[in-house]
Curated annotation (Swiss-Prot):
Positions of 5-amino-6-(D-ribitylamino)uracil binding: 24, 58-60, 82-84, 115
GO biological process terms held by the UniProt record: riboflavin biosynthetic process
Record keywords: Riboflavin biosynthesis, Transferase
UniProt-recorded name of the protein: 6,7-dimethyl-8-ribityllumazine synthase
Binding locations of (2S)-2-hydroxy-3-oxobutyl phosphate: 87-88, 129
Transferase recorded as keyword: yes
Family: Belongs to the DMRL synthase family.
Matches recorded under SUPFAM superfamilies: Lumazine synthase
UniProt source species: Cupriavidus pinatubonensis (strain JMP 134 / LMG 1197)
One term under GO cellular component: riboflavin synthase complex
Function: Catalyzes the formation of 6,7-dimethyl-8-ribityllumazine by condensation of 5-amino-6-(D-ribitylamino)uracil with 3,4-dihydroxy-2-butanone 4-phosphate. This is the penultimate step in the biosynthesis of riboflavin.
Gene this protein is translated from: ribH
Catalytic activity as recorded in UniProt: (2S)-2-hydroxy-3-oxobutyl phosphate + 5-amino-6-(D-ribitylamino)uracil = 6,7-dimethyl-8-(1-D-ribityl)lumazine + phosphate + 2 H2O + H(+)
Pathway: Cofactor biosynthesis; riboflavin biosynthesis; riboflavin from 2-hydroxy-3-oxobutyl phosphate and 5-amino-6-(D-ribitylamino)uracil: step 1/2
């Protein structure tokens, strides 16, 4: 049996990326953003094709992502933030609800959303993960934007073939 294979495509040229950065735990979030934007540039995403908006915290990220997705101006989105465990249940609430909201935006709008909301026990853990997570999110956004385009083109080809069969 023959199988097709679509290799990962990390060419960011021409892609438009929206980034929502939470400001809570600002030093960590600034490092996440710096790493993400630097990696997007390395992948060929132009600065003018990237829009960064900030929100107060992780729970506000999904709404900003939703508004960006509704605009139709982006090929992929990135969520950046940090939730550090405290002494109350709030950590679980913020982690779970922000994650669910981020996932819902991607599925509701058929748009790649890279989740870079760190959920960690300590500030030290957060700082140790910022560079890698920021880069990973940039790469995931570009790869998934290209994959969605490729898969949509398969559907479009199938639709054209169906139209040809109807004639």
């Amino acid at each position: 049996m023959d199988h097709g294979f679509y290799p990962s495509n990390l060419d960011g040229e021409g892609l438009r990326i929206g980034i929502v950065q939470a400001r809570f735990n600002e030093p960590v979030c600034a490092e996440l953003l710096e790493a993400c934007v630097a990696e997007l540039e390395k992948l060929g995403v132009e600065g003018e094709d990237t829009l960064v908006v900030t929100v107060p915290g992780a729970l506000e990220v999904p709404l900003a992502l939703q508004k960006m997705a509704e605009s139709g101006q982006f090929d992929a989105l990135v969520a950046l933030g940090a939730v550090v465990r405290g002494e109350t249940y709030h950590f679980e609430l913020v982690s779970n609800e922000s994650g669910a909201g981020i996932t819902r935006v991607g599925l509701d709008f058929n748009m790649p959303v890279a989740n870079g909301i760190l959920t960690v026990d300590t500030d030290e853990q957060a700082h140790a993960r910022t560079r890698e997570k920021g880069r990973d999110c940039a790469r995931a956004a570009v790869e998934m934007a290209n994959l969605v385009v490729a898969l949509d083109s398969l559907r479009d080809q199938e639709d054209e073939e169906d139209e040809d069969d109807d004639e």
